[in-house]
């Protein structure tokens, strides 16, 4: 039971590891917001620049 609880906690925390470690934030959708800097994004990956959004205020495969 204790092991199961630890595994559940790890599964809940691991997706946010990049969000915590990367100052650029994690891109998620829908509607597509890059946390914590708030730019729009087109894919569910860590894609925003550490300094914020790119010149199009967007992060994604086409506009990086």
UniProtKB/Swiss-Prot annotation:
Segment forming the signal sequence: 1-21
GO cellular component: extracellular region
Coiled coil: none
Main location: secreted
Keyword Cell inner membrane attributed: no
Keyword set, alphabetical order: Disulfide bond, Neurotoxin, Secreted, Signal, Toxin
PTM: Contains 4 disulfide bonds.
Entry's localization field: Secreted
Expression sites by tissue: Expressed by the venom duct.
Function: Probable neurotoxin.
Family: Belongs to the conotoxin O1 superfamily.
Full protein name: Conotoxin Cal12.4
Source organism of the structure: Californiconus californicus (California cone)
């Amino acid at each position: 039971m204790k092991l199961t609880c630890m595994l559940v906690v790890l599964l809940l925390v691991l997706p946010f590891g990049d969000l915590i470690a990367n100052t650029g934030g994690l891109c998620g959708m829908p509607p597509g917001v890059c946390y914590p800097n708030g730019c729009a994004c087109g894919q569910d990956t860590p894609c925003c620049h550490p300094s914020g959004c790119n010149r199009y205020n967007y992060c994604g495969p086409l506009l990086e």
